[in-house]
Amino acid sequence: MKFPRKGIPQEEVMRELEKYTSKDLSFSSGKILGSMCTLPHELAKEVFCMYMDRNLGDPGLHPGTKKIEEEVIEMLSDLLHLERGYGHIVSGGTEANILAVRAFRNLADVENPELILPKSAHFSFIKAGEMLGVKLIWADLNPDYTVDVKDVEAKISENTIGIVGIAGTTGLGVVDDIPALSDLARDYGIPLHVDAAFGGFVIPFAKELGYDLPDFDFKLKGVQSITIDPHKMGMAPIPAGGIVFRHKKYLRAISVLAPYLAGGKIWQATITGTRPGASVLAVWALIKHLGFEGYMEIVDRAMKLSRWFAEEIKKTPGAWLVREPMLNIVSFKTKNLRRVERELKSRGWGISAHRGYIRIVSHASCDGGHD
C-alpha cells in the first residue's frame, strides 16, 4: 500500500477500518478464552479517552499526571505489602521484566552476568537477556510445574546477578515457592525478582478469600522487585504494565538524564521515552473506584469460574487437566488436541494452545459477566 496523496472522507475511512477489524475477535463478544487481558472497565475506558494527550515522558508538562503515577505506585506498593516503593506504569510485563533485569545487572559488578529463572518463565526474559548481555540459566521444574528451588541453588555462581520467581505462569497460572526463593536469595545476597504480571492482581484478593496460595510479595525480605500488570486482571486499558522496586537504588541504576524536556534535569528509568499518561490515569481511577473489595469480588467470580471449568474437564471423556489450577487459569489436554483446537477456533472461540495443551483464562467483567 502506498502513502495516499489525497485524503478520503472520514466515513469511508471508518468503513475501511470496519472491513479489517471485523476479522478481529473482541473481548465484548465473550469468545476470547485464552488471553490474560480482558475487556477494560467502563470507567477506565472513559478516563483513557478523556486524557489521551497526556505524555508522562515529559512530566514537566503534566505535573498532575506525574503525581497520579506516584500515587498509583504507592497504592500498588501497599497492595504488595511495601510501605514505600519505587517504580512506574510501563507498556506491559515485558518492559517491566526487562527493567528489573537491567537494574540487577547495572548494580552488580559482574563481567559475565547470569540470571537464574524457571523454565516456565515468560519469553520476555529471553529478550532481556539478548538486549542486556545477560546469560539466562534455566532452572528445572518440579512435577507440579513449580520451580525446583534446589536446582536454583545448584546453579548459583559468582556471576549470578539475580533470581526470578513466577507468581502466575503464563501457561498454567502456577505460583512458584517464592518464600523459599526469598530465603535463598537472602542467604546468598542475591536480589529476587517476582514476575507477577498476571498474579499480582489475583493473589492478594484470592488469599483474602481463603485460597491457599503462597506469599509472593514484599512481605518476603528477599523480594527486591515485582512486575504487576493492571491491564490484565486489573481491568485497565492496554498499555498498563507495572514495575515496583523495594529500594530507590534500583530505579537510580536504570535512570538516564533527558535534559531538554520541560522543567529540565528530568531522569527517565523506563525503556520508552514517550509514555501514555492516560493509562496511568485510568489505573488510578479504577483502583480508587473498585478498591480492595471490588477487586476481591472480581477475583472471587473468576476463581469460581475456573474451579467449575476444571471440574467439567474432569467429567469429559478424553480430556484431562495438566494440573489443578492455582489461579484462574485452567489448562487441559485431549487425545485429539489439534482437532479440538481447530474445531473451537472454527466456531469463533479465541483459545490458546500452549505447549501441547489448551489454556483457558477465566475473567469476571465489571458487570458480573465473564469472557
From Swiss-Prot:
Molecular function terms, GO-annotated: aspartate 1-decarboxylase activity; pyridoxal phosphate binding
Protein's UniProt keywords contain Lyase: yes
PROSITE patterns, alphabetized: DDC_GAD_HDC_YDC (PS00392)
Entry EC no(s): 4.1.1.11
GO biological-process terms attached to the record: carboxylic acid metabolic process; coenzyme A biosynthetic process
Swiss-Prot/TrEMBL keywords: Decarboxylase, Lyase, Pyridoxal phosphate
Enzymatic reactions: L-aspartate + H(+) = beta-alanine + CO2
UniProt cofactor(s): pyridoxal 5'-phosphate
Keyword Transcription appears in the UniProt entry: no
Pathway(s) it belongs to: Cofactor biosynthesis; coenzyme A biosynthesis
One of the Pfam families matching this protein, by short name: Pyridoxal_deC
Record-listed N6-(pyridoxal phosphate)lysine modification sites: K232
Family to which this protein belongs: Belongs to the group II decarboxylase family. MfnA subfamily.
Function of the molecule: Catalyzes the decarboxylation of L-aspartate to produce beta-alanine.
Protein name per the record: Probable L-aspartate decarboxylase
Gene that encodes it: mfnA
